[in-house]
Regions:
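A cross-domain feature marking catalytic cores of carbohydrate-active enzymes
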Residues: 13, 47-48, 92, 141
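…and closely analogous acidic/polar surface helices at protein-protein or active-site interfaces
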Residues: 21-36
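Von Willebrand factor
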Residues: 36-53
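Short hydrophobic beta-strand that contains or immediately precedes a catalytic carboxylate
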Residues: 9-11
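Short acidic, Gly/Ser-rich segments with clustered Asp/Glu that frequently serve as metal-coordination loops
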Residues: 14-21
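Metal-dependent catalytic neighborhoods of phosphoester/phosphodiester hydrolases
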Residues: 55-59
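Active-site loop signature of alpha/beta-hydrolase-fold enzymes
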Residues: 16, 51-53, 146
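Active-site-adjacent betaalpha module
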Residues: 1-7, 34-39, 63-186
């Protein structure tokens, strides 16, 4: 079996995206990040930064997440984000900005385990972009959510299953059993 080089990508768990619909994933992600860091695996956080005149503002009329405290990673993950390999600031949906793509090339990740907010937007775009670059992308369904509620989250999971494969959308518990079946441990 080929050796794997995994990375955990935590997408946009920021104050401006954490609502009553998405807050439940914060402790799940916190525990997951702690475990990955303890095992010495790479962890990357992303942080979305909107700006004046962005397509989100001009086309969609959406002008949130421009400044603190909205853009800040939630308090529960602040210290952990400082221990991560990187926090990639982005003005687009995906991790794969110039910086994010360079990190992926430089570290040669074979498997990208993605969680965060919003499942149907930035999480989905990141797993699809990883897949299209030949990285085995995994969407962690119970460590991802939509700030708009369950229907958009479920829609994001469904679209991901069509785009990267049903078997690539797993729970954290399935990740743990997957980890025992594949080495090195993830």
């Amino acid at each position: 079996m080929a050796e794997i080089n995994p990375v955990l990508v935590v997408v946009d768990v920021q104050n401006g995206f954490v609502t009553e619909h998405s807050r439940h994933v914060v402790p799940v992600i916190e525990q997951l990040v702690r475990e990955w860091l303890e095992k010495g695996h790479d962890v990357v956080f992303t942080r979305y930064l909107n700006y004046h005149g962005s397509p989100f503002e001009k086309i969609m009329g959406w002008s949130k997440l421009k400044e603190s405290p909205e853009i800040d990673i939630v308090d529960e993950l602040q210290e952990l984000s400082k221990q991560a390999l990187a926090v990639v600031d982005k003005k687009v949906y995906t991790l794969f900005t110039e910086e994010g793509a360079e990190l992926a090339r430089e570290h040669g990740w074979t498997d990208m385990f993605v969680c965060g907010i919003d499942t149907e937007v930035c999480v989905l775009k990141t797993v699809v972009d990883a897949f299209e670059r030949g990285v085995r992308a995994w969407l962690l369904t119970d460590a991802s959510a939509s700030h708009s509620g369950e229907p958009p989250h479920s829609a994001g999971v469904l679209v991901a299953q069509k785009m990267i494969g049903r078997q690539q959308t797993i729970s954290v518990a399935e990740l743990e059993s997957h980890s025992r079946a594949r080495k090195p441990e993830v």
